[in-house]
């Protein structure tokens, strides 16, 4: 089975699991999944977040998801319990489709590492 086909099947599994739980009958988009991973990685449970916090949650998720690829490394938790990452390597210039594939690969890896798929 090809790598692309495996990614597609794994991605659909992740999408179906999360959409069934959080989608209210709709399929979640990539940004919503990244946001949910940020909430999970923050570890403070489900609560109301301000707009700036939502952006920061997505940043946490992206850093955490790209850590295994060597782009980021966890640095410290601040006084509010928010994780901070340092850049190890700048992301290469990617086209929109390439960014999407990279994030899907990272999310599938995250779910496999956490034994959720």
Model-inferred region functions:
Residues 49-99:
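Amphipathic protein-protein interaction modules
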Residues 2-3, 31-35, 90-93, 113:
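Intrinsic, low-complexity terminal and presequence regions
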């Amino acid at each position: 089975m090809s790598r692309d086909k495996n990614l597609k099947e794994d991605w659909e599994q992740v999408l179906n699991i999360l959409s069934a739980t959080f989608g209210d009958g709709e399929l979640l988009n990539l940004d919503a999944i990244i946001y949910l991973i940020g909430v999970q990685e923050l570890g403070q449970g489900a609560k109301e977040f301000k707009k700036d916090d939502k952006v920061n949650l997505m940043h946490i998720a992206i850093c955490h998801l790209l850590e295994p690829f060597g782009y980021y490394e966890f640095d410290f938790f601040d006084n509010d319990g928010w994780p901070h990452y340092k850049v190890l390597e700048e992301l290469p210039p990617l086209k929109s489709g390439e960014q999407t594939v990279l994030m899907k690969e990272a999310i599938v890896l995250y779910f496999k590492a956490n034994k959720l798929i």
